[in-house]
Amino acid sequence: MRNRRNIFLIGPMGAGKTTVGRLLARALGMEFWDSDKEIERRTGVTVPMIFEYEGEAGFRRRESEVIADLTGKERIVLATGGGSVLAAENREHLAARGLVIYLQCSVQKQLERTHKDMNRPLLQTENPRQRLEELLRVRDPIYRELADYVVDTGQHSSRSAVRRIINAYEKSGTRLRTE
């Protein structure tokens, strides 16, 4: 049976998953988790260091372990890494264990939000825009297929996104807030 009390945020880097996730968890009295931060906590090193020493495959393996663990929790909001949806096992855990929200935004908005962040290994390239466009081309169909709801964070504030998520979910017949 699907656990509709967890909320999992998916989407590209810079879409606001961590920011919206923290606000959403606070509004709902739920626990917030960020899969990338949990990977760093468990390994004691940064995501860029994992990419450097283990490559993307090593990082994705660690990410799958963390997602399997975290999605087994109750009443959490989880901000996932942008590429977490690439692994079938991650998609299965997310779909079966909670409500999946796709936070989407334009490549331009992603660039504005991430251009100074050196902790984005996939953007350490000569042409970050082209890289983001490539990632979106591959991942957007996966995000859309997996998502229960899609919320555009490029045109609205984080607080507005939180309100839209809560309203959409409550219209589906389940109350999220703890009274």
From Swiss-Prot:
Q: Which residues bind substrate?
A: D36, R60, G82, R139
- Enumerate the residues binding Mg(2+): T18
Q: Which reaction does it catalyse?
A: shikimate + ATP = 3-phosphoshikimate + ADP + H(+)
Q: Which InterPro entries does its entry note?
A: P-loop_NTPase, Shikimate/glucono_kinase, Shikimate_kinase/TSH1, Shikimate_kinase_CS
Instruction: Give the pathway.
Output: Metabolic intermediate biosynthesis; chorismate biosynthesis; chorismate from D-erythrose 4-phosphate and phosphoenolpyruvate: step 5/7
Q: How does it assemble?
A: Monomer.
Q: Which Pfam families match?
A: SKI
List where in the cell it is found: Cytoplasm
- Which species expresses this protein natively? Methylococcus capsulatus (strain ATCC 33009 / NCIMB 11132 / Bath)
Main location group: cytoplasm
Give yes or no: UniProt keyword Magnesium: yes
Q: Which PANTHER family match?
A: SHIKIMATE KINASE (PTHR21087), SHIKIMATE KINASE 1, CHLOROPLASTIC (PTHR21087:SF16)
Positions with a binding annotation for ATP: G14, A15, G16, K17, T18, T19, R120
- Can you tell me which family this protein belongs to? Belongs to the shikimate kinase family.
What is the annotated role of this protein in its UniProt record? Catalyzes the specific phosphorylation of the 3-hydroxyl group of shikimic acid using ATP as a cosubstrate.
Keywords, A to Z, come to: Amino-acid biosynthesis, Aromatic amino acid biosynthesis, ATP-binding, Cytoplasm, Kinase, Magnesium, Metal-binding, Nucleotide-binding, Transferase
An annotated GO cellular component of this protein is: cytosol
Cleavable signal peptide: none
* Example of a GO biological process term: chorismate biosynthetic process
EC no. given is 2.7.1.71
Q: Which GO terms describe its molecular function?
A: ATP binding; magnesium ion binding; shikimate kinase activity
Protein name per the record? Shikimate kinase
The note on cofactor binding and number reads:
Binds 1 Mg(2+) ion per subunit.
The protein's required cofactors? Mg(2+)
